[in-house]
Amino acid sequence: LYVSAMSVKNKGGSDGDSSNARMSVRTGRECFKSLTTAEAVTLVSLPEKVRVSLPAGNKVTADMVQTDDAFWHIFRFRFLSGKAFTKADSDAGVPCAVLSAAVARRLFGTTDVAGKTVQLNYVEYRISGVVADVSVLATSAYAQVWIPYTSTDIARLAWWEETVGQMRAVILARSAADFPAIREEAEQLRRKYNDSLRDSEVFYRGQPDEQFANLYRKWSETPDTKAIILRYMLVIAILLLVPAINLSSMTLSRMRRRMAEIG
């Protein structure tokens, strides 16, 4: 399940008079990391460009996301060297990073670099591990560098009573049968969180989403998944129908020629 964005409004205001944004670390922790009905919950920032370099050595620009240890439980990666940063690393804000194979090779010429040090925008980070490259089509997991968000000041980049920030939440259920319970608990946590706010309240516009709905969600627009599926079915039907019509026409044309030959 996914919560890619949220809305915030003045307490008691209408949903139409609201702003849409990513959630803050505080909102993510209190409203989603606290879920007990889910197997795991991770907070993930959007990819940002970062300068990855060696002191007086090679450098490369890469896409970096900030996340936590639960990310490595929810998404499966193939480690070529080392391992993911741990819960202890994440809780303590240890400056450690996981690199993609492409970035490791550009910098070191090899992927066997766990334990070595790189600079991310001139800040030193220890390399925990190296993973096989991730396709940009894997939008929820893609990056070239992953670091704990506790190792930066991203938690302080929050506004509107610290509800809005730069994070999104990904929730792993034990099974699809748990989706209703997870959504119900998320709503309970949302109401509890709003009670703690003085002037604001947050809401999710139908989220958490399943994967298909998440792909088509655009900020405040709740995707009409039934209409999207019908549209795809129509396109597929047309793609299948056109060759069938062409084949029928060819068969009919040949039959007419044969009939003419027979007399």
Predicted feature residues:
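Mid-to-C-terminal secondary-structure elements
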Residues: V65, D69-A84, P95-P223
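Intracellular coupling helices
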Residues: I245-G263
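Structured, solvent-exposed hinge/loop segments at the ends of secondary-structure elements
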Residues: L1-L107, T111, Q119-Y125
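N-terminal membrane-entry
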Residues: S220-A237
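Residue-level recognition of transmembrane alpha-helices
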Residues: Y122, E185, V235-I236, R254
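Membrane-helix interface segments
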Residues: N58, D178, K226-L230, R258-M259
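Faces of alpha-helical transmembrane segments in polytopic inner-membrane proteins
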Residues: I238-I245
